[in-house]
A protein has these predicted regions:
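Iron-sulfur (Fe-S) cluster-binding modules
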Residues: 1-79, 105-109, 127-130, 135-142, ...
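Metallocofactor- and cofactor-centric catalytic cores in central/energy metabolism, strongly enriched
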Residues: 52, 86, 90-95, 99-103, ...
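Short, well-ordered secondary-structure micro-motifs within conserved domains or adaptor modules
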Residues: 76, 81-88
């Protein structure tokens, strides 16, 4: 089968040609921007909570900030999510669980580290048992604070959405 689409020649079996055609369409700017818009406004996080930042995130979900209006819908099962929120200190034992949860998430997937403990270990920074998320996962956004204010969390969500829409997010491998 031979077909020409503005310089793209598809030769071979139907499956291979279809895969190339889909990749060509996805790489076109209008379709990519629609796809990135859809991903940006359907961030469904799985919370990996090991410290107090998880309680502070509840304030972000409350009516005053209402992150659900930004398409931020929490889910329980990692196979239904595309954003991992690490909230708290990661020990070596929990790091294995974090990687296991991350590997279950479908593509494209993103990671945010929330709080001083998640960023660099917090008060446990020099412990032998602490693992920084950036050493085991591709962290997209860091939210500083102990715990971070709800405004900072909402701002981080907006920053991630902007990076996705611009195609600059680490998790966009497609």
């Amino acid at each position: 089968m031979v077909c020409g689409m503005s310089g793209l020649t598809l030769v071979g079996n139907l499956e291979e040609s279809a895969r190339k055609a889909v990749q060509w369409l996805v790489n076109k700017t209008p379709i990519r921007s629609i796809r990135d818009w859809g991903i940006a406004f359907s961030l469904w996080p799985v919370h990996f909570t090991t410290a107090c930042c998880g309680a502070e995130f509840a304030a972000t979900s409350a009516p005053r900030f209402d992150v659900e209006r930004m398409g931020f819908l929490p889910f329980v099962a990692p196979r239904q999510t595309n954003l991992m929120l690490i909230e708290g200190t990661l020990t070596r034992k929990m790091a294995k669980a974090a990687v296991w949860v991350y590997e279950q998430m479908p593509e494209p997937k993103f990671v945010m580290a929330m709080g001083a403990c998640a960023i660099d270990g917090g008060i446990f920074w020099n412990s032998y048992n602490i693992v920084r998320p950036k050493d085991i996962l591709p962290v997209e956004i860091y939210i500083p604070g102990c715990p971070p204010r709800p405004e900072a969390v909402a701002r981080a969500i907006l920053m991630l959405q902007k990076r996705i829409r611009e195609g600059k997010a680490i998790g966009l491998k497609i």
